[in-house]
């Protein structure tokens, strides 16, 4: 009996996959919806009776899982890079002109979908996991939710290992329909798609019409020579690729490429989905490897971002905001205006110099844009209805302390300023720092305004059950807040050091400190008590300059900062982080390096990432201050320049031991 059920399940899965391909890839469905649904229900029934036969590639998983998703962070197996971008066609043409195609012109052009970036991992042809791009090194695990998108094959029909990039999006039509029923509407379809994808219950996600385009291989278990062949393979495997992708070869001209870009730009508003630009890629994979990568982006691809669409609005008021560093930033409150797919009600004015340069004041009519289709900005005054220009107050709007000008910006220097305090707490809880879930800016502001907390330390001593009498705070939410606070105590010392807010101390500098045996509070504290010795010691670390060295020394001689560390120590925080680095790897710490050529079995981003993890500092170009150049096969002009500058040359064999 069980063998018959197992066979029927296998037959149903095969048939449903066939219908999925006909409907979503070929656009030629052979059965009506009710027939499809009937077979899905039968498969669900059988899998419920015999759960041992339910596999990860089952089509029933596309309708949601009974399990709840916790969106844990998972490390990407390869760095997930961004794209370089330009905003005008002259710069785009210049980028194309610089590429040495060796009389074999090959470029692909496709719309840049304005959605949520996703990375799909297939193991032996089965979808193993799906991660958001995150910060490029770590992404959120949204596998259960991605499985609900019927355009994502759970099984490829081939036992291959693939890492693919795609964009999850929602159509303009569905965006408008869904937004009507939401208590808090989203400003654009990208945010809605991202919000849906991050819903905790995958059963809810299955009810939303998410779409996906797959557009790139990050690490393929298949051998391709060109992007053309790779895209065709994606189609055959059942993935949805953008039908507007076009390939230009040696028979084409740059003019034809630019004409196609102009055509896409002209028609962008007629597409069923939002786009914010066009992406150009070199099609030849061998040439891609020769062109290489920077730490941020591949050199073989370029995004042409559309000029920000603009609108006109009236400045109703100008408010002054205070950041965690005390920096004063003026912001214009304007009449609501719809620009590039989003409503804008405020826009940064940067600083006093910028306001003066455009002669802006309250009451003026201004041109507003979203730079890069993201950042709201006041570009210029269109109609001047005021007298003179707005002047940033000479006192902090929060604590009334006289502000001090440093460079182009004004700063509040009061360490007890309420605005500075609340912004520091927000920074402490933010994703890049302690990543304390549930503590949104709104929640933190509420706690601060009610005088429940005045610093980040209060988060660990406050009785959150006092919030039960306030609207929006129930047992479940409060328990989640408490659990998040407790979980943060287990974060590594590097996160605490970053979160505590030492001026200009970032992740890279912290890594350099740790790799030089300054990996605990006690070591840093002892060092900094002798200011002169500490200054000389820190300057010996390649990558640390005078300014950041002084900031570190000042911080570890500041009684307020020291007391914070002591309190965190008493709360059970880790005050030391082990760094496993042998004598051989110490040779790389602080060394500046660059790479050229290709490396057998390793992509350039992986080489860079592994050397950086050993303490080396990646540079994009060869200069006199470079410590060594890593040379692979088919090295480019960087090798010649390095030889002229007497920069040390290291082969792939020289560094291979560092990569394992």
From Swiss-Prot:
Active site: 112
Keywords: DNA damage, DNA repair, DNA replication, Ligase, Magnesium, Manganese, Metal-binding, NAD, Zinc
Cofactor: Mg(2+); Mn(2+)
Pfam families registered for this protein in UniProt: BRCT, DNA_ligase_aden, DNA_ligase_OB
Keyword Nucleus: no
EC number(s) per entry: 6.5.1.2
Entry-linked PROSITE patterns: BRCT
GO biological process: DNA repair; DNA replication
Chemical reaction(s) catalysed: NAD(+) + (deoxyribonucleotide)n-3'-hydroxyl + 5'-phospho-(deoxyribonucleotide)m = (deoxyribonucleotide)n+m + AMP + beta-nicotinamide D-nucleotide
Family: Belongs to the NAD-dependent DNA ligase family. LigA subfamily.
Function: DNA ligase that catalyzes the formation of phosphodiester linkages between 5'-phosphoryl and 3'-hydroxyl groups in double-stranded DNA using NAD as a coenzyme and as the energy source for the reaction. It is essential for DNA replication and repair of damaged DNA.
Protein name: DNA ligase
Organism: Borreliella afzelii (strain PKo)
Organismal lineage: Bacteria, Pseudomonadati, Spirochaetota, Spirochaetia, Spirochaetales
């Amino acid at each position: 009996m069980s063998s018959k059920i197992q066979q029927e399940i296998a037959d149903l899965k095969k048939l449903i996959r066939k219908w999925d391909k006909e409907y979503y890839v070929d656009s030629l469905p052979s059965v009506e919806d009710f027939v499809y649904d009937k077979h899905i229900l039968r498969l669900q029934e059988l899998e419920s009776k015999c759960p041992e036969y339910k596999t990860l590639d089952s089509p029933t998983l596309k309708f949601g899982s009974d399990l709840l998703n916790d969106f844990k962070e998972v490390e990407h197996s390869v760095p997930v890079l961004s794209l370089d971008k330009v905003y005008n066609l002259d710069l785009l043409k210049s980028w194309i002109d610089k590429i040495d195609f060796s009389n074999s012109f090959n470029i692909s052009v496709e719309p840049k979908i304005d959605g949520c970036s996703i990375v799909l991992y297939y193991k032996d042809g089965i979808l193993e996991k799906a991660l958001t791009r995150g910060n490029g090194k770590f992404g959120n695990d949204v596998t259960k939710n991605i499985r609900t998108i019927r355009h994502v094959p759970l099984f490829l029909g081939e036992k291959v290992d693939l890492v693919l990039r795609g964009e999850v999006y929602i159509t303009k039509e569905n965006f408008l329909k869904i937004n009507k029923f939401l208590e808090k509407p989203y400003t654009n379809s990208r945010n809605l798609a991202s919000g849906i994808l991050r819903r905790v219950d995958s059963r809810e996600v299955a009810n939303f019409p998410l779409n996906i385009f797959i557009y790139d291989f990050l690490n393929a278990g298949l051998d391709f020579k060109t992007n053309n062949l790779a895209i065709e393979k994606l189609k055959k495997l059942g993935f949805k690729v953008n039908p507007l992708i076009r390939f230009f070869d040696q028979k084409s001209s740059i003019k034809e490429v630019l004409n196609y870009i102009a055509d896409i730009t002209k028609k962008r508003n007629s597409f069923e989905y939002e786009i914010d630009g066009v992406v150009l890629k070199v099609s030849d994979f061998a040439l891609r490897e020769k062109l290489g990568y920077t730490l941020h982006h591949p050199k073989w691809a370029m995004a042409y971002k559309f000029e920000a669409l603009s609108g006109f609005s009236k400045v109703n008021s100008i408010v002054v905001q205070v950041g965690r560093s005390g920096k004063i930033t003026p912001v214009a409150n304007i009449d609501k205006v719809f620009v590039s797919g989003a409503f804008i009600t405020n826009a940064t004015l940067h600083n006093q110099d910028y306001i003066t340069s455009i002669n802006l004041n309250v009451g003026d009519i201004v041109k507003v844009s979203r730079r890069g289709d993201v950042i709201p900005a006041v570009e210029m005054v269109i109609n001047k209805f005021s007298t003179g220009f707005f002047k940033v107050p000479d006192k902090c709007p929060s604590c009334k302390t006289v502000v001090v000008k440093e460079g182009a910006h004004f700063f509040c220097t009061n360490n007890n300023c309420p605005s500075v305090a609340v912004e520091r707490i927000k920074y402490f809880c933010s994703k890049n720092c302690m990543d304390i879930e549930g503590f949104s800016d709104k929640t933190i502001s509420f706690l601060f305004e009610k005088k429940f907390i005045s610093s980040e330390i209060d988060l660990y001593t406050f009785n959150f059950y006092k919030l039960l009498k306030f609207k929006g705070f129930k047992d479940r939410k409060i328990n989640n807040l408490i659990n998040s606070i407790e979980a943060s105590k287990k974060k590594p010392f590097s996160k605490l050091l970053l979160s505590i807010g030492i001026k200009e101390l970032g992740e890279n500098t912290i890594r350099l400190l740790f790799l030089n045996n300054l990996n605990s509070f006690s070591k840093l504290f002892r060092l900094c008590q002798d200011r002169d010795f500490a200054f000389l010691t820190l300057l010996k670390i390649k990558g640390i300059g005078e300014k950041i060295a002084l900031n570190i020394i000042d911080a570890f001689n500041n009684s307020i900062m020291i007391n914070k560390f002591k309190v965190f120590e008493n709360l059970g925080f880790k005050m030391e982080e082990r760094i496993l680095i042998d004598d051989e790897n110490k040779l790389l710490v602080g060394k500046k390096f660059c790479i050229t050529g290709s490396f057998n079995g390793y992509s350039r981003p992986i080489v860079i990432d592994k050397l950086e993890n050993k303490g080396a500092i990646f540079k994009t170009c060869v200069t006199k201050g470079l410590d060594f150049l890593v040379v692979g096969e088919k090295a480019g002009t960087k090798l010649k320049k390095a030889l002229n500058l007497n920069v040390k040359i290291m082969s792939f064999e020289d560094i291979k031991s560092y990569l394992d």
